[in-house]
Amino acid sequence: MPRTPHLLAIQSHVVFGHAGNAAAVFPMQRIGINVWPLNTVQFSNHTQYGRWTGQVLPPEQIPALVEGIAGIGELGNCDAVLSGYLGSAAQGRAILEVVGRIKQANPRALYLCDPVMGHPEKGCIVAPEVSDFLLEEAAAVADYLCPNQLELDSFCDRQPNSLADCVEMARSLLARGPRAILVKHLNYPGKAGDTFEMLLVAADQVWHLQRPLLAFPRQPVGVGDLTSGLFLSRLLLGDDLRNAFEFTSAAVHEVLLETQARGSYELELVRAQDRIAHPRVRFDAVRL
């Protein structure tokens, strides 16, 4: 019987709704991953509601918790680390310390960094020190980097004028160290308004994918967290880059279809769980 992969997910958590680990953990478990959630912040709800309560985990607690796992002899079983929203740059450095500790215990372990920087229109902006950390430190350590368009622009200090520019920008990030760049949401002049586009760039391959863009009165939160978690999970389950890319897009689309059908603001993960595991429609990635 194949061994079940283990993944340490270090990102935010909300008590109500789905963002950060609350968006990613259950879907990753549903497709066959043992997830170890470590919450960088715990908020009552996501910040787009305009009000919330909660607290940030002190940075020193991150390696302390992981050291506890090492103490029971389980750290070498960790196959991957996923990081997302950070409450501070100090948290980010603590995560890189943990990544190094895990790679020492298991040299084959992967690290996927979702470089969450937020967006002015969505009411979630990380501190400048966090953006600097992601740009200057995290990208050099990550095996996989999963920015959205805003974050790609920040990494490259420019905005694209075409899809070709997006490819060039993602390729430039490979020089910092990652094996591949997954751009979770493309936005560039000339892009069709009725499509949602993604891009996957590695040293020897470039894949572009389109699916229908679904309309919502209020855009659901947590889609990027879901995307990064599913992509890393499929790699751990043995998919190559293209298949992980296509599966992730299809599964996320299934969640959004159910969310739209229910008129929900929060992602309908539970109702869509079977379609997360077995998407009904596959969107073919095109090699560029």
Swiss-Prot record:
What the entry lists under InterPro entries is as follows:
PM/HMP-P_kinase-1 (IPR013749), PyrdxlKinase (IPR004625), Pyridoxal_kinase_PdxY (IPR023685), Ribokinase-like (IPR029056)
Record pathway: Cofactor metabolism; pyridoxal 5'-phosphate salvage; pyridoxal 5'-phosphate from pyridoxal: step 1/1
Question: Which residues participate in substrate binding?
Answer: S12, T47, Q48, D225
Alphabetically list the UniProt keywords: ATP-binding, Kinase, Magnesium, Nucleotide-binding, Transferase
Q: Does the keyword Magnesium apply?
A: yes
What EC number(s) has UniProt assigned to this enzyme?
2.7.1.35
Q: Which cofactor does it need?
A: Mg(2+)
Q: Which CDD domains match?
A: pyridoxal_pyridoxamine_kinase
Reactions catalysed, semicolon-separated, are: pyridoxal + ATP = pyridoxal 5'-phosphate + ADP + H(+)
Residues binding ATP, per UniProt: D114, E151, K184, R211, P212, L213, L214
Entry-linked HAMAP family: PdxY (MF_01639)
Its name, as the record gives it, is: Pyridoxal kinase PdxY
Write the gene name: pdxY
